[in-house]
Amino acid sequence: MSEIWEDAIKSNAWPFVEAKKILDSLNGKVPEKNYVLFETGYGPSGLPHIGTFGENARMVMVQKAFEQLSDISTKLICFSDDMDGLRKVPSNIPNPEMVAGYMDMPLTSIPDPFGECESYGHYMNAKLRSFLDKFGFEYEFYSSTNCYKAGMFDEMLIRVLEKYDEIMELMLPTFREERKATYSPFMPICPKTGKVLQVPIEKWDAKAGTVRYKDEAGNYVEVPVTGGHCKLQWKPDFGMRWAALKVDYEMYGKDHLANARLYSEICRILGGKPPVQLCYELFLDENGEKISKSKGNSISVDDWLKYAPVESMALFMYQNPTRAKRLFFDVIPKNVDEYITFNQKYHLEEDRAKRFANPVYHIHHGNVPKIETFGITYALLLNLTSVCNPSDKSVLWGFISKYEPKATPKTSPYLDHLAEFAIRYYNDFIKAYKSYLAPSEKHKVILQDILDMLSSISDQTEAEAIQKAIYDIGMKAGYENLRDYFKDLYQILLGQSEGPRLGTFIKLYGIKETMKLVEGKLYTR
Protein backbone atom coordinates (compact mmCIF):
# COMPACT_ATOMS: atom_id res chain seq x y z
CA MET A 1 0.00 0.00 0.00
CA SER A 2 1.23 3.50 -0.87
CA GLU A 3 2.84 5.55 1.90
CA ILE A 4 0.43 8.41 1.22
CA TRP A 5 -2.68 6.21 1.08
CA GLU A 6 -4.27 7.29 4.37
CA ASP A 7 -3.86 11.02 3.76
CA ALA A 8 -4.95 10.72 0.12
CA ILE A 9 -8.18 8.94 1.06
CA LYS A 10 -8.74 11.33 3.98
CA SER A 11 -8.46 14.30 1.60
CA ASN A 12 -11.57 13.13 -0.29
CA ALA A 13 -10.24 14.92 -3.39
CA TRP A 14 -12.20 13.54 -6.31
CA PRO A 15 -9.14 12.35 -8.33
CA PHE A 16 -8.11 10.18 -5.36
CA VAL A 17 -11.71 8.96 -4.97
CA GLU A 18 -11.71 7.89 -8.63
CA ALA A 19 -8.25 6.31 -8.33
CA LYS A 20 -9.44 4.21 -5.39
CA LYS A 21 -12.43 3.00 -7.45
CA ILE A 22 -10.01 1.76 -10.13
CA LEU A 23 -7.87 -0.03 -7.54
CA ASP A 24 -10.97 -1.62 -6.01
CA SER A 25 -12.06 -2.86 -9.45
CA LEU A 26 -8.70 -4.62 -9.91
CA ASN A 27 -9.15 -6.62 -6.69
CA GLY A 28 -5.47 -6.28 -5.90
CA LYS A 29 -4.36 -7.78 -9.22
CA VAL A 30 -2.24 -6.32 -12.00
CA PRO A 31 -4.14 -6.45 -15.34
CA GLU A 32 -2.96 -9.10 -17.84
CA LYS A 33 -1.70 -6.33 -20.11
CA ASN A 34 0.52 -5.17 -17.19
CA TYR A 35 -0.82 -1.62 -17.10
CA VAL A 36 -4.00 0.29 -16.32
CA LEU A 37 -5.52 1.91 -19.41
CA PHE A 38 -7.18 5.32 -19.25
CA GLU A 39 -9.13 6.42 -22.33
CA THR A 40 -10.52 9.74 -23.50
CA GLY A 41 -12.61 10.14 -26.63
CA TYR A 42 -12.81 12.86 -29.26
CA GLY A 43 -15.43 13.41 -31.95
CA PRO A 44 -13.58 15.34 -34.68
CA SER A 45 -16.63 16.70 -36.50
CA GLY A 46 -15.72 20.22 -35.39
CA LEU A 47 -12.74 22.06 -34.00
CA PRO A 48 -11.58 20.86 -30.56
CA HIS A 49 -13.00 23.06 -27.81
CA ILE A 50 -12.24 23.68 -24.20
CA GLY A 51 -14.39 20.72 -23.14
CA THR A 52 -12.04 18.43 -25.04
CA PHE A 53 -9.11 19.91 -23.15
CA GLY A 54 -11.09 19.58 -19.92
CA GLU A 55 -11.72 15.87 -20.34
CA ASN A 56 -8.04 15.20 -20.91
CA ALA A 57 -6.95 17.46 -18.04
CA ARG A 58 -9.32 15.71 -15.65
CA MET A 59 -8.30 12.29 -16.92
CA VAL A 60 -4.63 13.03 -16.24
CA MET A 61 -5.53 14.20 -12.73
CA VAL A 62 -7.07 10.78 -12.05
CA GLN A 63 -4.19 8.98 -13.76
CA LYS A 64 -1.61 10.80 -11.63
CA ALA A 65 -3.65 10.20 -8.47
CA PHE A 66 -3.73 6.49 -9.33
CA GLU A 67 0.05 6.49 -9.80
CA GLN A 68 0.36 8.03 -6.32
CA LEU A 69 -1.67 5.19 -4.79
CA SER A 70 -0.28 2.26 -6.79
CA ASP A 71 2.90 1.05 -8.47
CA ILE A 72 0.99 -0.44 -11.45
CA SER A 73 2.01 1.17 -14.75
CA THR A 74 -0.52 3.35 -16.58
CA LYS A 75 -1.22 4.44 -20.12
CA LEU A 76 -3.52 7.15 -21.48
CA ILE A 77 -4.96 6.95 -24.97
CA CYS A 78 -6.90 9.63 -26.78
CA PHE A 79 -9.28 7.96 -29.21
CA SER A 80 -10.62 9.89 -32.20
CA ASP A 81 -13.87 8.74 -33.82
CA ASP A 82 -12.62 9.92 -37.19
CA MET A 83 -14.26 7.12 -39.18
CA ASP A 84 -17.73 8.45 -38.35
CA GLY A 85 -19.79 9.63 -41.30
CA LEU A 86 -20.37 13.38 -41.52
CA ARG A 87 -23.95 14.10 -40.43
CA LYS A 88 -23.90 17.90 -40.32
CA VAL A 89 -21.63 20.62 -41.67
CA PRO A 90 -20.23 22.74 -38.80
CA SER A 91 -21.05 26.45 -39.05
CA ASN A 92 -17.53 27.60 -38.16
CA ILE A 93 -15.39 26.05 -40.92
CA PRO A 94 -14.30 27.41 -44.32
CA ASN A 95 -15.67 25.99 -47.60
CA PRO A 96 -18.88 24.59 -46.07
CA GLU A 97 -20.40 24.08 -49.54
CA MET A 98 -17.54 21.78 -50.52
CA VAL A 99 -17.83 19.82 -47.28
CA ALA A 100 -21.61 19.48 -47.75
CA GLY A 101 -20.91 17.41 -50.86
CA TYR A 102 -19.36 14.69 -48.69
CA MET A 103 -22.24 13.96 -46.32
CA ASP A 104 -22.09 10.45 -44.77
CA MET A 105 -18.45 10.03 -45.80
CA PRO A 106 -15.93 9.07 -43.09
CA LEU A 107 -14.27 12.21 -41.77
CA THR A 108 -10.89 10.90 -42.93
CA SER A 109 -12.25 10.57 -46.49
CA ILE A 110 -13.37 14.22 -46.81
CA PRO A 111 -10.94 16.78 -48.28
CA ASP A 112 -9.59 19.23 -45.71
CA PRO A 113 -11.62 22.48 -46.00
CA PHE A 114 -8.68 24.31 -44.41
CA GLY A 115 -6.35 23.09 -47.15
CA GLU A 116 -3.63 21.93 -44.77
CA CYS A 117 -3.97 18.15 -44.27
CA GLU A 118 -4.87 15.08 -46.28
CA SER A 119 -8.44 15.07 -44.94
CA TYR A 120 -10.94 16.88 -42.75
CA GLY A 121 -10.47 14.24 -40.03
CA HIS A 122 -6.68 14.51 -40.20
CA TYR A 123 -6.91 18.30 -39.78
CA MET A 124 -9.15 18.02 -36.71
CA ASN A 125 -6.94 15.31 -35.23
CA ALA A 126 -3.87 17.50 -35.76
CA LYS A 127 -5.59 20.37 -33.96
CA LEU A 128 -6.39 18.14 -31.00
CA ARG A 129 -2.89 16.73 -30.80
CA SER A 130 -1.21 20.11 -31.11
CA PHE A 131 -2.90 21.56 -28.07
CA LEU A 132 -2.61 18.36 -26.03
CA ASP A 133 1.11 18.42 -26.85
CA LYS A 134 1.28 22.12 -25.97
CA PHE A 135 0.18 21.39 -22.41
CA GLY A 136 2.46 18.42 -21.91
CA PHE A 137 -0.12 15.63 -21.86
CA GLU A 138 1.52 12.22 -22.18
CA TYR A 139 -0.79 10.09 -24.30
CA GLU A 140 -0.99 7.74 -27.26
CA PHE A 141 -3.22 8.86 -30.10
CA TYR A 142 -5.58 6.28 -31.60
CA SER A 143 -7.46 6.89 -34.84
CA SER A 144 -10.69 4.93 -35.35
CA THR A 145 -9.94 4.78 -39.09
CA ASN A 146 -6.50 3.31 -38.46
CA CYS A 147 -7.75 0.86 -35.83
CA TYR A 148 -10.48 -0.51 -38.12
CA LYS A 149 -8.31 -0.66 -41.25
CA ALA A 150 -5.28 -2.15 -39.49
CA GLY A 151 -7.38 -5.00 -38.10
CA MET A 152 -7.02 -4.01 -34.46
CA PHE A 153 -10.75 -4.59 -33.94
CA ASP A 154 -11.14 -7.60 -36.27
CA GLU A 155 -11.39 -10.20 -33.51
CA MET A 156 -14.08 -8.22 -31.72
CA LEU A 157 -15.98 -7.53 -34.96
CA ILE A 158 -16.20 -11.28 -35.61
CA ARG A 159 -17.41 -11.66 -32.03
CA VAL A 160 -20.12 -9.06 -32.71
CA LEU A 161 -21.27 -11.31 -35.58
CA GLU A 162 -21.26 -14.30 -33.24
CA LYS A 163 -23.26 -12.37 -30.63
CA TYR A 164 -25.40 -10.56 -33.21
CA ASP A 165 -28.78 -11.72 -31.89
CA GLU A 166 -27.87 -10.97 -28.27
CA ILE A 167 -26.72 -7.46 -29.18
CA MET A 168 -29.87 -6.84 -31.21
CA GLU A 169 -32.01 -7.98 -28.26
CA LEU A 170 -30.23 -5.38 -26.14
CA MET A 171 -30.41 -2.55 -28.66
CA LEU A 172 -33.84 -2.84 -30.33
CA PRO A 173 -35.96 -1.96 -27.27
CA THR A 174 -34.20 1.43 -27.17
CA PHE A 175 -35.52 2.47 -30.62
CA ARG A 176 -38.79 3.60 -32.14
CA GLU A 177 -40.63 1.16 -34.39
CA GLU A 178 -39.39 2.59 -37.70
CA ARG A 179 -35.76 2.47 -36.53
CA LYS A 180 -36.15 -1.08 -35.26
CA ALA A 181 -36.94 -2.19 -38.81
CA THR A 182 -33.65 -0.85 -40.23
CA TYR A 183 -31.17 -1.04 -37.35
CA SER A 184 -28.02 -3.11 -37.37
CA PRO A 185 -24.89 -2.69 -35.26
CA PHE A 186 -22.86 -2.82 -38.49
CA MET A 187 -22.54 0.06 -40.93
CA PRO A 188 -20.92 -1.08 -44.20
CA ILE A 189 -18.63 1.29 -46.07
CA CYS A 190 -20.09 1.44 -49.58
CA PRO A 191 -17.52 0.02 -52.07
CA LYS A 192 -18.77 2.43 -54.76
CA THR A 193 -19.31 5.73 -52.94
CA GLY A 194 -17.20 5.29 -49.80
CA LYS A 195 -20.14 6.42 -47.65
CA VAL A 196 -20.90 5.01 -44.21
CA LEU A 197 -24.23 3.26 -44.81
CA GLN A 198 -27.04 2.94 -42.32
CA VAL A 199 -28.90 0.12 -44.04
CA PRO A 200 -30.74 -3.02 -42.91
CA ILE A 201 -28.47 -6.07 -42.82
CA GLU A 202 -30.18 -8.90 -44.70
CA LYS A 203 -27.75 -11.64 -43.70
CA TRP A 204 -24.74 -12.10 -41.46
CA ASP A 205 -22.26 -14.95 -41.39
CA ALA A 206 -19.90 -15.26 -38.42
CA LYS A 207 -17.84 -18.04 -40.02
CA ALA A 208 -17.30 -16.10 -43.25
CA GLY A 209 -17.01 -12.81 -41.34
CA THR A 210 -19.41 -11.02 -43.71
CA VAL A 211 -22.67 -9.10 -43.81
CA ARG A 212 -25.05 -8.67 -46.75
CA TYR A 213 -27.24 -5.68 -47.57
CA LYS A 214 -29.11 -4.15 -50.51
CA ASP A 215 -27.61 -1.13 -52.25
CA GLU A 216 -29.59 1.79 -53.69
CA ALA A 217 -30.17 -0.13 -56.93
CA GLY A 218 -31.66 -3.07 -55.04
CA ASN A 219 -28.65 -5.33 -55.61
CA TYR A 220 -27.27 -7.51 -52.85
CA VAL A 221 -23.78 -6.56 -51.70
CA GLU A 222 -21.70 -8.72 -49.40
CA VAL A 223 -18.74 -7.22 -47.53
CA PRO A 224 -16.38 -8.42 -44.81
CA VAL A 225 -16.84 -6.80 -41.42
CA THR A 226 -13.07 -6.75 -40.90
CA GLY A 227 -10.28 -4.63 -42.36
CA GLY A 228 -12.18 -1.35 -42.32
CA HIS A 229 -14.98 -2.51 -44.66
CA CYS A 230 -17.55 -1.88 -41.89
CA LYS A 231 -17.71 0.12 -38.73
CA LEU A 232 -20.03 -0.23 -35.79
CA GLN A 233 -22.82 2.10 -34.80
CA TRP A 234 -21.57 4.42 -32.09
CA LYS A 235 -23.18 2.67 -29.11
CA PRO A 236 -21.89 -0.83 -29.96
CA ASP A 237 -18.61 0.80 -31.02
CA PHE A 238 -18.15 2.24 -27.55
CA GLY A 239 -18.60 -1.11 -25.82
CA MET A 240 -16.57 -2.99 -28.44
CA ARG A 241 -13.69 -0.58 -27.99
CA TRP A 242 -13.69 -1.10 -24.23
CA ALA A 243 -13.51 -4.86 -24.76
CA ALA A 244 -10.90 -4.74 -27.56
CA LEU A 245 -8.53 -2.32 -25.84
CA LYS A 246 -9.25 -3.55 -22.29
CA VAL A 247 -9.99 -0.04 -21.04
CA ASP A 248 -9.89 0.33 -17.24
CA TYR A 249 -11.13 3.91 -16.83
CA GLU A 250 -13.20 6.24 -18.98
CA MET A 251 -14.97 9.52 -18.37
CA TYR A 252 -17.67 11.01 -20.57
CA GLY A 253 -20.14 13.86 -20.67
CA LYS A 254 -23.70 13.68 -19.38
CA ASP A 255 -24.96 13.28 -22.96
CA HIS A 256 -23.58 9.71 -22.79
CA LEU A 257 -25.16 8.83 -19.44
CA ALA A 258 -28.38 7.36 -20.84
CA ASN A 259 -26.36 4.96 -23.01
CA ALA A 260 -23.66 4.01 -20.49
CA ARG A 261 -25.58 0.87 -19.51
CA LEU A 262 -25.61 -0.21 -23.17
CA TYR A 263 -21.88 0.41 -23.58
CA SER A 264 -21.15 -1.68 -20.49
CA GLU A 265 -23.51 -4.51 -21.44
CA ILE A 266 -22.11 -4.77 -24.97
CA CYS A 267 -18.61 -4.89 -23.50
CA ARG A 268 -19.72 -7.81 -21.28
CA ILE A 269 -21.46 -9.61 -24.17
CA LEU A 270 -18.18 -9.46 -26.09
CA GLY A 271 -16.31 -10.97 -23.16
CA GLY A 272 -14.84 -7.77 -21.78
CA LYS A 273 -15.00 -6.06 -18.41
CA PRO A 274 -16.50 -2.55 -18.46
CA PRO A 275 -14.18 0.16 -17.13
CA VAL A 276 -14.71 2.29 -14.06
CA GLN A 277 -16.58 5.32 -15.34
CA LEU A 278 -17.09 8.96 -14.39
CA CYS A 279 -19.91 10.97 -15.92
CA TYR A 280 -19.14 14.69 -15.88
CA GLU A 281 -21.62 17.50 -16.41
CA LEU A 282 -21.50 19.52 -19.59
CA PHE A 283 -20.37 23.11 -19.90
CA LEU A 284 -23.03 25.67 -20.75
CA ASP A 285 -22.64 28.93 -22.63
CA GLU A 286 -23.81 32.27 -21.20
CA ASN A 287 -27.37 31.47 -22.36
CA GLY A 288 -27.40 28.16 -20.52
CA GLU A 289 -27.08 26.09 -23.72
CA LYS A 290 -24.66 23.18 -24.14
CA ILE A 291 -21.41 24.20 -25.78
CA SER A 292 -20.81 22.52 -29.10
CA LYS A 293 -17.83 22.00 -31.41
CA SER A 294 -20.04 22.39 -34.47
CA LYS A 295 -21.79 25.55 -33.18
CA GLY A 296 -18.56 27.12 -32.01
CA ASN A 297 -20.44 28.75 -29.10
CA SER A 298 -17.74 28.27 -26.51
CA ILE A 299 -14.50 29.76 -25.32
CA SER A 300 -11.58 28.13 -27.06
CA VAL A 301 -8.39 27.20 -25.27
CA ASP A 302 -6.61 29.97 -27.16
CA ASP A 303 -9.29 32.47 -26.07
CA TRP A 304 -8.78 31.63 -22.40
CA LEU A 305 -4.99 31.78 -22.68
CA LYS A 306 -5.20 35.23 -24.24
CA TYR A 307 -6.55 36.57 -20.95
CA ALA A 308 -5.26 34.26 -18.21
CA PRO A 309 -2.64 31.66 -17.26
CA VAL A 310 -3.26 28.00 -18.06
CA GLU A 311 -3.47 27.15 -14.33
CA SER A 312 -6.70 29.13 -14.03
CA MET A 313 -8.23 27.09 -16.85
CA ALA A 314 -7.10 23.86 -15.20
CA LEU A 315 -8.72 25.02 -11.94
CA PHE A 316 -12.02 25.57 -13.76
CA MET A 317 -11.77 21.98 -15.03
CA TYR A 318 -10.93 20.59 -11.59
CA GLN A 319 -13.80 22.20 -9.71
CA ASN A 320 -16.97 20.10 -9.34
CA PRO A 321 -16.78 17.95 -12.50
CA THR A 322 -20.21 16.43 -11.84
CA ARG A 323 -21.93 19.84 -11.65
CA ALA A 324 -23.03 21.83 -14.72
CA LYS A 325 -21.11 25.11 -15.05
CA ARG A 326 -21.50 28.13 -17.26
CA LEU A 327 -18.43 28.71 -19.36
CA PHE A 328 -18.07 32.23 -20.71
CA PHE A 329 -15.55 35.04 -20.47
CA ASP A 330 -16.83 36.39 -17.14
CA VAL A 331 -15.55 33.28 -15.31
CA ILE A 332 -11.91 33.95 -16.19
CA PRO A 333 -11.00 36.64 -13.59
CA LYS A 334 -12.69 34.67 -10.80
CA ASN A 335 -10.72 31.53 -11.61
CA VAL A 336 -7.43 33.43 -11.79
CA ASP A 337 -7.94 34.86 -8.31
CA GLU A 338 -9.16 31.55 -6.89
CA TYR A 339 -6.04 29.88 -8.25
CA ILE A 340 -3.84 32.50 -6.52
CA THR A 341 -5.69 31.92 -3.23
CA PHE A 342 -5.40 28.13 -3.47
CA ASN A 343 -1.70 28.41 -4.35
CA GLN A 344 -0.98 30.56 -1.32
CA LYS A 345 -2.97 28.27 1.01
CA TYR A 346 -1.15 25.21 -0.31
CA HIS A 347 2.28 26.56 0.59
CA LEU A 348 1.13 27.65 4.05
CA GLU A 349 -0.53 24.30 4.83
CA GLU A 350 1.42 21.68 6.80
CA ASP A 351 -1.31 19.03 6.99
CA ARG A 352 -0.65 16.63 4.09
CA ALA A 353 -4.28 15.52 3.76
CA LYS A 354 -5.34 19.16 3.41
CA ARG A 355 -2.63 19.70 0.80
CA PHE A 356 -4.00 16.72 -1.12
CA ALA A 357 -7.47 18.29 -0.92
CA ASN A 358 -6.20 21.51 -2.49
CA PRO A 359 -6.95 21.74 -6.25
CA VAL A 360 -3.45 23.01 -7.07
CA TYR A 361 -1.96 19.69 -5.95
CA HIS A 362 -3.87 17.96 -8.75
CA ILE A 363 -3.44 20.76 -11.28
CA HIS A 364 0.35 20.49 -10.94
CA HIS A 365 0.43 16.74 -10.13
CA GLY A 366 2.11 17.37 -6.80
CA ASN A 367 4.79 19.79 -8.03
CA VAL A 368 3.14 23.09 -7.10
CA PRO A 369 5.12 26.23 -8.00
CA LYS A 370 5.15 29.05 -5.47
CA ILE A 371 3.90 32.30 -6.94
CA GLU A 372 4.16 35.81 -5.49
CA THR A 373 1.68 38.55 -6.31
CA PHE A 374 2.22 40.69 -3.15
CA GLY A 375 -1.50 40.62 -2.38
CA ILE A 376 -2.45 42.02 -5.79
CA THR A 377 -5.29 40.13 -7.44
CA TYR A 378 -6.38 39.93 -11.06
CA ALA A 379 -9.61 41.74 -10.16
CA LEU A 380 -7.59 44.53 -8.58
CA LEU A 381 -5.45 44.86 -11.71
CA LEU A 382 -8.61 45.05 -13.83
CA ASN A 383 -9.90 47.91 -11.69
CA LEU A 384 -6.55 49.67 -11.80
CA THR A 385 -6.61 49.30 -15.58
CA SER A 386 -10.13 50.70 -15.59
CA VAL A 387 -9.10 54.00 -14.01
CA CYS A 388 -5.72 54.56 -15.67
CA ASN A 389 -6.50 53.09 -19.13
CA PRO A 390 -2.87 52.06 -19.77
CA SER A 391 -1.37 51.58 -23.20
CA ASP A 392 0.94 48.88 -21.86
CA LYS A 393 1.79 47.08 -18.63
CA SER A 394 4.64 49.47 -17.72
CA VAL A 395 1.95 51.96 -16.64
CA LEU A 396 0.51 49.38 -14.24
CA TRP A 397 3.97 48.59 -12.93
CA GLY A 398 4.38 52.25 -12.02
CA PHE A 399 1.52 51.87 -9.54
CA ILE A 400 2.54 48.36 -8.44
CA SER A 401 6.11 49.45 -7.63
CA LYS A 402 4.89 52.32 -5.45
CA TYR A 403 2.49 49.94 -3.66
CA GLU A 404 5.17 47.28 -3.11
CA PRO A 405 8.80 48.32 -3.82
CA LYS A 406 9.93 44.67 -3.73
CA ALA A 407 7.68 43.86 -6.67
CA THR A 408 9.29 43.91 -10.10
CA PRO A 409 8.67 41.96 -13.31
CA LYS A 410 11.70 39.85 -12.37
CA THR A 411 10.76 39.14 -8.74
CA SER A 412 7.16 38.42 -9.69
CA PRO A 413 6.93 37.16 -13.27
CA TYR A 414 3.46 35.79 -12.51
CA LEU A 415 2.25 39.28 -11.59
CA ASP A 416 3.92 40.62 -14.73
CA HIS A 417 1.92 38.19 -16.87
CA LEU A 418 -1.28 39.11 -15.00
CA ALA A 419 -0.71 42.79 -15.78
CA GLU A 420 -0.52 41.98 -19.47
CA PHE A 421 -3.59 39.73 -19.31
CA ALA A 422 -5.56 42.39 -17.41
CA ILE A 423 -5.01 45.03 -20.09
CA ARG A 424 -6.19 42.65 -22.81
CA TYR A 425 -9.24 41.59 -20.82
CA TYR A 426 -10.15 45.18 -19.96
CA ASN A 427 -9.88 46.32 -23.58
CA ASP A 428 -11.98 43.44 -24.91
CA PHE A 429 -14.65 42.97 -22.23
CA ILE A 430 -14.91 45.95 -19.87
CA LYS A 431 -14.01 49.17 -21.66
CA ALA A 432 -16.98 49.24 -24.04
CA TYR A 433 -19.48 48.32 -21.33
CA LYS A 434 -18.60 50.87 -18.64
CA SER A 435 -21.63 52.85 -17.50
CA TYR A 436 -21.05 55.64 -14.98
CA LEU A 437 -23.59 56.78 -12.42
CA ALA A 438 -23.97 60.55 -12.16
CA PRO A 439 -23.65 61.43 -8.46
CA SER A 440 -26.77 62.71 -6.69
CA GLU A 441 -26.62 65.36 -3.96
CA LYS A 442 -26.41 62.57 -1.38
CA HIS A 443 -23.54 61.01 -3.32
CA LYS A 444 -21.71 64.35 -3.48
CA VAL A 445 -21.76 64.59 0.31
CA ILE A 446 -20.26 61.09 0.46
CA LEU A 447 -17.60 61.93 -2.13
CA GLN A 448 -16.65 65.08 -0.19
CA ASP A 449 -16.35 63.00 3.00
CA ILE A 450 -14.07 60.57 1.15
CA LEU A 451 -11.97 63.48 -0.14
CA ASP A 452 -11.64 64.92 3.36
CA MET A 453 -10.65 61.51 4.70
CA LEU A 454 -8.04 60.99 1.98
CA SER A 455 -6.53 64.43 2.54
CA SER A 456 -6.05 63.60 6.22
CA ILE A 457 -4.03 60.40 5.71
CA SER A 458 -0.60 59.62 4.29
CA ASP A 459 0.77 57.13 1.79
CA GLN A 460 1.92 55.04 4.75
CA THR A 461 -1.67 54.44 5.94
CA GLU A 462 -2.52 50.73 5.75
CA ALA A 463 -5.15 49.45 3.32
CA GLU A 464 -7.29 48.09 6.16
CA ALA A 465 -7.41 51.51 7.85
CA ILE A 466 -8.50 53.12 4.57
CA GLN A 467 -11.13 50.40 4.09
CA LYS A 468 -12.53 51.02 7.59
CA ALA A 469 -12.70 54.76 6.96
CA ILE A 470 -14.61 54.19 3.69
CA TYR A 471 -16.90 51.80 5.56
CA ASP A 472 -17.56 54.34 8.33
CA ILE A 473 -18.51 56.98 5.75
CA GLY A 474 -21.10 54.57 4.34
CA MET A 475 -22.51 53.87 7.80
CA LYS A 476 -22.80 57.60 8.45
CA ALA A 477 -24.59 58.10 5.11
CA GLY A 478 -27.54 56.04 6.33
CA TYR A 479 -27.57 53.15 3.84
CA GLU A 480 -29.76 50.25 5.01
CA ASN A 481 -27.55 47.85 3.07
CA LEU A 482 -23.89 48.77 2.68
CA ARG A 483 -23.75 46.68 -0.50
CA ASP A 484 -25.80 49.42 -2.14
CA TYR A 485 -23.33 51.99 -0.87
CA PHE A 486 -20.34 50.23 -2.37
CA LYS A 487 -22.25 49.53 -5.58
CA ASP A 488 -22.95 53.26 -5.93
CA LEU A 489 -19.27 54.08 -5.38
CA TYR A 490 -18.17 51.51 -7.96
CA GLN A 491 -20.63 52.87 -10.54
CA ILE A 492 -19.63 56.48 -9.89
CA LEU A 493 -15.86 55.94 -9.79
CA LEU A 494 -15.30 52.87 -11.99
CA GLY A 495 -18.36 52.68 -14.22
CA GLN A 496 -19.27 49.17 -13.09
CA SER A 497 -21.54 47.61 -10.48
CA GLU A 498 -18.86 45.50 -8.80
CA GLY A 499 -15.37 46.31 -7.68
CA PRO A 500 -12.44 45.70 -5.34
CA ARG A 501 -11.94 46.32 -1.65
CA LEU A 502 -11.52 50.07 -1.91
CA GLY A 503 -8.86 50.24 0.80
CA THR A 504 -6.56 47.96 -1.18
CA PHE A 505 -7.44 49.67 -4.46
CA ILE A 506 -6.70 53.15 -3.08
CA LYS A 507 -3.43 51.91 -1.59
CA LEU A 508 -2.43 50.51 -5.01
CA TYR A 509 -3.68 53.44 -7.09
CA GLY A 510 -2.30 56.03 -4.68
CA ILE A 511 -3.87 58.64 -2.37
CA LYS A 512 -3.29 61.62 -4.67
CA GLU A 513 -4.47 59.77 -7.76
CA THR A 514 -7.63 58.63 -5.97
CA MET A 515 -8.32 62.19 -4.82
CA LYS A 516 -8.07 63.36 -8.43
CA LEU A 517 -10.46 60.58 -9.46
CA VAL A 518 -13.00 61.57 -6.78
CA GLU A 519 -12.64 65.29 -7.56
CA GLY A 520 -13.31 64.54 -11.22
CA LYS A 521 -16.64 62.97 -10.32
CA LEU A 522 -17.53 65.54 -7.64
CA TYR A 523 -16.87 68.72 -9.59
CA THR A 524 -17.74 67.66 -13.15
CA ARG A 525 -21.20 68.76 -14.21
From Swiss-Prot:
It is an enzyme of class 6 (ligase). Its main location: cytoplasm. A motif ('KMSKS' region) lies at residues 290-294. This is Lysine--tRNA ligase. PANTHER family: LYSINE--TRNA LIGASE. It comes from the Bacteria. ATP binds at K293. Its EC number is 6.1.1.6. GO terms for biological process: lysyl-tRNA aminoacylation. Belongs to the class-I aminoacyl-tRNA synthetase family. GO terms for cellular component: cytoplasm. It is found in: Cytoplasm.
